[in-house]
Each structure stands twice: as structure tokens, then as C-alpha cells.
């Protein structure tokens, strides 16, 4: 994390002040080199952690000027952050913002405190604050009397110097969003993340996950809003195509659209490029499940349309592909059982329901009920995980 903005320089005959630091945003507090304040800060920086707080207290009391209080609050924030006393860090961070609203380093430190504490509310509040400070700086006109070309160069250099902090904030935000346990909050955080980083691959992926989280939170209107928004920008987003195909086919709504989305997902699964950060084995497993999921949705569309033979064909193809995912596999076999029943193929239906009941999933009990109705409950094998 970036250091506190303590500006010092050689003591000149005219008692000159230290130059501004290019790597910071916010007020540049000038500390006269060789002054009492300079000596106090040097002592703070050199002190053992057990002695720092008393020295910071002394500095704050002996330098009441608002600019020096900025430096004091920065020292308090760093001390409490390193001591993992996060509430105290937040307290002094807010005091610092009151004196220096555009202090980017303070915003980054608050993000760090919130991330380490696991406080997602504060994490996004301060993350948005950090991004707002950067955005305002990028949009700011040249200061009065500054040549526009010089200003462009200075601004570029400063933004480059802040890149590591900017990357840290982004990573902290996306990590916090994905780790939020409540699906409704997770979805909201991911949408907020996307708004902060629009037109990026991370933004698109965040929205795709947000759509799924909204569905988990039983907020279907928001799921549809977010998912359709993703497809409007990226019609080939396989995750969203699968989500909508599954939702529509399961509910018996917009079946033609569901079928189109499912078929497109099957085609995309064969052409997707493997990301660099995933192994060949993991990638193969992922696309195998995606293709099986899409075929299962195709089969469900056919079931809804009373096209049982087509349903059997799609669901049978999906069966092999979904074996590594208990929930999807069990649901697919449950659907396949009904497709066979519609064709009056009781033996095949019994086999499909038996397979659905053989794995630990929400479909186990329903499959067992169907087997009981068919008079074959005694033949149900011991429950097991799919191979």
C-alpha cells in the first residue's frame, strides 16, 4: 500500500518547502525540511510500533494547522490499519476525508481496511469513492496557468504511478462481490462493480454472475433485466444463453427463444477458446457440462411442446455429458423419465428415474416417488454420486 504523503527536502537557505509528490491525488502538504514537524515525522517513521501511537498523538497536538492535521490523520490511518484495528482506521479515514476529500491514498487504505475486515458495505462505499476521485482527476481541466501539453504529461505520469493501487481496488471489489454469501447482495455488488468498470471483460462476467445470483435470490425480474442487458451487448455470452434457456424452458415460457438460445449454446461450446488461467482438464469439464446443460434445456423445450421423441434424443445426449454434476444430471434423467413415459416406454422410463434417484440431489425424492408409482421402488439402487 502506498506510503503516507510526507514531503521533505533539503533545507535551503530560504527555508524552502518540499516539492509536491507526483504519485498522489489530493492536497500536497508541504513540510519544511528540518522543522520540528519534520523531525517528529522522522521519529514516527523510525519508531517501534509500540511507540508510534504516542508519537503520532504528540505530532497531532503540537501541529493544529489543518494541513498538518491531514498528515496526522494519515499517520493514524496507517497505524491502525497495520494494527488491524479497522474501526479506528475508518474513524480517522473519515476525519481525513473531511479535510482532504480527494485523498486517493486514503480511499485505497479504506478499501484495504474494509476488505481485510470483510465489510462488503464499506468496501463498495470506499471503492466507489476511490473510483470517483480518479474519474474526477482524469476529467479535470489543466490548472490555471498550466500548459495543456504539460498537464497531459503530468496527469499521465501520475495515473501510471497509481496503477498498482487502482488494480488493487478493482481486485478487492470483485473479490468481495463474489465472496458475498447472500445472493441478493452478491448480485447488487456485482452490478455496482460493472458500473465502475464498464466495457471490460470483468464487467461482462460480473453481470453474468449477477444474473444467476438474482435468480438464486428469487428476483426473476432483475435476473431477466440484467441477463438481457448482457445479451444486448454480447449475443454470444454462453453463460447467459444457458441461464435464459434454462429459465424459459423450465417455466414453459418463450419456448422458441429458449430453444434458439440452447442450440446456440451447444454450438458455442464447441468453439469457445480456453482462457489462459484454467487447465485443459478443468476447461474440458466446464464445456462438457455447458453443452450437456444446453442439450437438457433443448429436451425440456421439446417436453413442453409435447415432442417426446425429440426430447428423448436431446436428453439422452445430455445424460453422458452431465454425469459430473449431480444436480443437472439428476434433473436431466428425471426429465428423460417423463419423455419415455409419454412414449409409453415404461422400462426406459424406470431406468431414467432410477438414475435420477441414484445421486444426491433435490430430484432424488421426486424420482423415488415416480418409481413407487411405477411399482419399481424396490429396484432403486443405493444412492451414489455420479461418476
Regions found by a protein language model. Name each.
Residues 17-75, 83-84, 125, 137, ...:
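N-terminal leader/linker segments that initiate helical-solenoid repeat arrays
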Residues 78, 112, 178, 212, ...:
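Residue-level recognition of tetratricopeptide repeat
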Residues 27-32, 165-171, 188, 275-277, ...:
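Terminal, low-structured helical/coil segments at or just beyond the last alpha-helical repeat
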Residues 46, 83, 117, 180, ...:
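Structural motif corresponding to the intra-repeat A-B loop/turn of tetratricopeptide repeats
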Residues 38, 75, 109, 171-175, ...:
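"A position-specific structural signal for the A-helix of alpha-solenoid helical repeats
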Residues 62-69, 98-105, 135-146, 160-164, ...:
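Short solvent-exposed coil/turn linkers within tandem alpha-helical repeat scaffolds
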Residues 112-139, 249, 259-270, 316, ...:
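TPR/TPR-like (Sel1-like) alpha-helical repeat modules
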Amino acid at each position: 500500500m502506498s506510503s503516507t504523503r510526507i514531503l521533505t527536502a533539503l533545507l535551503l537557505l530560504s527555508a524552502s518547502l518540499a516539492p509536491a509528490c507526483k504519485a498522489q491525488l489530493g492536497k500536497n502538504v508541504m513540510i519544511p525540511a528540518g522543522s520540528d514537524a519534520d523531525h517528529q515525522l522522522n521519529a514516527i517513521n523510525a519508531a517501534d510500533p509500540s511507540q508510534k501511537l504516542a508519537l503520532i498523538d504528540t505530532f497531532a497536538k503540537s501541529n493544529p494547522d489543518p494541513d498538518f492535521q491531514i498528515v496526522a490523520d494519515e499517520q493514524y490511518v496507517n497505524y491502525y490499519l497495520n494494527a488491524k484495528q479497522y474501526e479506528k482506521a475508518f474513524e480517522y479515514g473519515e476525519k481525513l476525508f473531511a479535510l482532504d476529500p480527494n485523498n486517493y491514498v486514503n480511499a485505497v487504505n479504506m478499501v484495504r481496511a474494509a476488505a481485510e475486515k470483510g465489510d462488503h458495505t464499506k468496501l463498495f462505499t470506499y471503492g466507489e469513492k476511490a473510483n470517483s476521485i480518479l474519474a474526477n482527476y482524469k476529467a479535470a481541466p489543466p490548472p490555471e496557468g498550466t500548459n495543456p501539453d504539460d498537464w497531459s504529461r503530468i496527469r499521465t505520469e501520475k495515473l501510471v504511478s497509481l496503477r498498482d493501487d487502482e488494480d488493487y481496488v478493482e481486485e478487492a471489489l470483485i473479490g468481495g462481490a463474489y465472496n458475498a454469501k447472500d445472493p441478493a447482495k452478491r448480485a447488487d455488488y456485482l452490478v455496482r462493480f460493472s458500473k465502475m468498470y464498464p466495457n471490460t471483460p470483468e464487467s461482462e462476467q460480473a453481470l453474468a454472475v449477477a444474473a444467476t445470483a438474482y435468480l438464486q435470490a428469487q428476483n426473476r425480474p432483475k435476473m431477466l433485466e440484467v441477463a438481457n442487458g448482457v445479451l444486448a451487448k454480447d449475443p454470444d455470452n454462453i453463460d447467459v444463453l444457458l441461464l435464459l434457456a434454462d429459465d424459459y424452458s423450465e417455466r414453459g415460457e418463450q419456448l422458441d427463444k429458449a430453444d434458439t438460445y440452447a442450440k446456440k449454446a451447444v454450438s458455442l461450446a464447441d468453439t469457445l477458446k480456453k482462457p489462459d488461467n484454467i487447465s485443459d482438464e478443468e476447461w474440458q469439464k466446464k464445456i462438457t457440462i455447458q453443452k450437456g446443460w444446453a442439450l437438457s434445456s433443448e429436451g425440456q423445450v421439446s417436453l413442453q411442446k409435447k415432442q417426446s421423441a425429440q426430447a428423448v434424443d436431446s436428453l439422452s445426449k445430455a445424460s453422458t455429458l452431465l454425469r459430473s454434476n449431480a444436480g443437472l444430471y439428476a434433473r436431466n434423467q428425471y426429465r428423460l423419465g417423463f419423455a419415455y413415459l409419454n412414449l409409453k416406454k415404461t422400462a426406459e422410463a424406470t431406468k431414467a428415474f432410477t438414475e435420477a434417484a441414484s445421486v444426491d440431489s433435490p430430484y432424488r425424492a421426486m424420482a423415488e416417488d415416480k418409481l413407487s408409482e411405477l411399482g419399481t421402488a424396490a429396484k432403486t439402487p443405493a444412492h451414489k454420486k455420479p461418476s
